[in-house]
Structures are given as C-alpha cells and as structure tokens.
C-alpha cells in the first residue's frame, strides 16, 4: 500500500489517483470522477466535507479534487492499493 498526501487548491482540478484506493479529504473540497484522464472546464464535482472518505474500487478510474474554500490550499490523503 502506498500512502501519499496530495495538495489541492481552488483554481483547478488536481488528479488524486487512478488506482484502487481510499481517499480522505483534509479540508472541504469537491471531488470529480471520470473514466478518462480529461476534465473539462465546466465539470462539476461532489461536495466532500473535511474528514470525509471515498473508496475508489477500480484501477483506471480517475479521481480529481479541488478545494471548496476559496484560494486556501488543502490536502487529500490517498492510500493506494
């Protein structure tokens, strides 16, 4: 298992993982899921609260994150299998 912390900000989507993983949000954020490695400018994500977790159960599914609280930088903890 690989554990990593990914910094996200409010300006653009950041790729969190494309592996089977457990993702924990360390600040209020948006999450976007896609089956291709492309995010359009008008993509809308799910609202995720600080401490909320998401399980990505399939390799090849791209999970992106973006901060929901202005320009503050937040992080996401990702544990990839």
Which residues are covered by each model-predicted region?
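Short, surface-exposed beta-strand/strand-loop-strand elements in extracellular ectodomains
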Residues: 26-42
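Noncatalytic modules at the cell exterior or secretory-pathway interfaces
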Residues: 18-23, 56-71
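Surface-exposed ligand/attachment interfaces on beta-rich extracellular proteins
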Residues: 1-19
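Short intrinsically disordered terminal tails
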Residues: 1, 80-81
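Edge beta-strands of jelly-roll/beta-sandwich modules across compartments, strongly enriched
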Residues: 31-33, 69-79
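Beta-sandwich interaction modules
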Residues: 14, 47-58
């Amino acid at each position: 298992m690989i554990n990593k912390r990914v910094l996200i900000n409010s300006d653009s989507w950041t790729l969190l993982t494309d592996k089977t993983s457990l993702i924990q949000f360390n600040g209020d954020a948006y999450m976007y899921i896609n089956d291709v490695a492309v995010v359009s400018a008008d993509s809308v994500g799910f609202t995720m609260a600080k401490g909320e977790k998401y399980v990505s159960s399939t390799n090849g599914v791209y999970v992106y994150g973006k901060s929901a609280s202005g320009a503050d930088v937040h992080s996401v903890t990702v544990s990839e299998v």
